[in-house]
Regions:
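A nucleotide- and high-energy phosphate-metabolite-utilizing enzyme signature
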Residues: 1-321
């Protein structure tokens, strides 16, 4: 990664390489698990979500995964699948932990019985979240809707994606609730284009690039992708797919791409320097340590986020509170 940074590689190329390496490691662990526990009773697909699902991983990442398995034909087969995948996913979780991937703090992992289910149950989950967009359902939606098949029967994940696209067709109420979430996370820039930083604590005078920079862009583009039934999960691939299909993206596609690439690259540089110094990587930077060009570029990115959020408020004005 250090060599790629020196050569001026784009952030998206670096995150793709990191994701590919992580995917290969995960697939190897899953192959070992299959040898250890034998052939599964039914076909399954291991899916990643969050930054892993979007292929946007940096150095600091935890386990965000789930398991979809084919609908069992009998009660006996369902029991066998339940027992098999309980042991299987526990082994994978511990193996990933030993390889340096900590468990998800919110327990969004296949080792949690709630997140390893047959396809029919997953379809019910999605239908429930979309039809009743309460806060918990929206939290699950934001987490899971970036799911990507990593190993196994990818057709199971593709069928679930098709089901989700169908559920969201003309679902203005759910999309309105999602829009409401999207516009609440405003970028850290004040009225006079000054940075809004942490006022106290361990990160005093710093700002969180992930929460206040990357996340708003990811959320904005995800909303637009859900509006148009886009199958892609990565932010940049979604922007490409939306260029000819969404009026806001048509107008600001290049700006969205540049803003995302810039903030992500700033984050990767920051984390690489921390690791090189023997420190734990985080997402906090002190804007006073940025060059004038970097300050200008990040302010432009934050202003773009504000502009997009204003357009979303206009689009969903009766549903924003």
């Amino acid at each position: 990664v250090g060599l790629l940074l020196k050569e001026g590689a784009r952030a998206s190329n670096i995150t793709k390489i990191i994701t590919e390496l992580n995917d290969r490691l995960l697939r190897k662990i899953l192959e070992i698990a299959e040898r250890k526990f034998g052939k599964p009773p039914v076909a399954y697909c291991w899916v990643a979500f969050g930054s892993e699902g979007r292929k946007e991983q940096t150095f600091k990442t935890d386990q965000d995964n789930a398991l979809i398995f084919a609908d069992p034909e009998t009660a006996e087969q369902e029991d066998a699948a339940g027992r098999y995948f309980a042991e299987f996913t526990a082994f994978v979780r511990e193996s990933l932990l030993r390889c340096g991937f900590p468990p998800c703090p919110a327990d969004y992992m296949a080792s949690n019985a709630r997140w390893r289910q047959p396809l029919r149950v997953w379809k019910k989950y999605l239908a429930s979240w979309v039809s009743t967009p309460m806060p918990e359902a929206l939290m699950h939606a934001v987490t899971f809707f970036d799911f990507r098949p990593v190993y196994g029967e990818a057709a199971l994940a593709e069928e679930l994606r098709t089901s989700l696209i169908g559920l969201l067709r003309d679902q203005k109420v759910f999309l309105g609730h999602m829009a409401n979430l999207v516009v609440k996370n405003t970028p850290p820039i004040g009225f006079f284009k000054s940075f809004v930083v942490e006022k106290d604590g361990a990160h005093k005078d710093e700002l969180n690039l992930k929460v206040k920079g990357i996340a708003p862009l990811v959320d904005i583009i995800r909303l637009f992708a859900l509006e148009r039934g886009v199958r892609e999960t990565s932010t940049l691939e979604r922007i490409t797919a939306l260029r000819g299909a969404h009026t806001i993206v048509q107008e600001y596609a290049d700006e969205f791409e540049n803003a995302f690439e810039f903030i992500m690259l700033l984050r990767i540089h920051h984390q690489y320097e921390q690791i090189s110094d023997g420190r734990t990587p985080d997402n906090f930077i002190n804007p006073n340590e940025l060059s004038n060009l970097e300050k200008r570029s990040i302010k432009d990115a934050f202003q773009l986020i504000t502009k997009a959020q204003d357009l979303i408020i206009e689009r969903y004005k009766s549903m924003i509170w």
